[in-house]
């Protein structure tokens, strides 16, 4: 799927901080160069959520106090990851039993969430339609720059650490040109411009040194190394069987009506029937009166 990189054409790889060299997903750094990185956390309305930031954890996404003001990821891997953390499972579990228990927990959540979202989180959190949502740190930075009442936390119980990397597909014909482009993206000023524009964290140590002190110390973009080492996990590619199991469970979760919706179906149907009956009776009465005259 990917071509091995010729690092003679990528001398700026020297700028990549040691933390992101030889990552778990590419142990020998043969196929990829990190571009940006970040964590998954919780965006929340600081004016409406009365829980101290240090106490906010994933269970808030099941909190009935914020019912119908909670958003949830609209993709299975991120949604299941949150359930996996809550249940004490690995973020890379392939156990059918554990995935099924995660699905049960996600079904329970349906009674309190407003919607499953991805990019819609920007509009809903920005407009105050929702109070809390899981999302990516880089996008949280963008949101908080625009809406000062929003905050972001990375839960103590753990989270996903993700890395966006530059790679070259196996079928690419201009491999050397692609490597030169990767090298260009690793130039300190280019990496600095990238992180400044999109809000995601940079793995480029030279670019990091160019950031202002406030950004360097911002725990949203750059959590403590102790937290990163002890409380984060990088996703691994799951087996085809585990992926299919998760997808099937997710489809079931999304298609299952929650109890709060079900309980209104019969009453609403009866009201509609009664209303329709009354309308029919009134119309017949009016028609009969017209016939008399």
What do these predicted regions represent?
Residues 1-129:
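Extracytoplasmic ligand-binding site segments that recognize negatively charged/polar headgroups
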Residues 2-15, 32, 148-160, 169-172:
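Short beta-strand->loop
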Residues 1, 63-67, 84-88, 107, ...:
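Sec-exported extracytoplasmic/periplasmic mature domains
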Residues 226-293:
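Conserved C-terminal helix/tail region of periplasmic/extracytoplasmic solute-binding proteins
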Residues 99-108, 146-170, 216:
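Periplasmic-binding protein-like
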Residues 57-58, 121-124, 140, 178, ...:
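Short, hydrophobic alpha-helical packing/hinge segments within bilobed ligand-binding/sensory domains
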Residues 169-230:
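Mature extracytoplasmic/periplasmic domains
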Residues 132-149:
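A ligand-binding cleft/hinge motif common to bilobed small-molecule-binding domains
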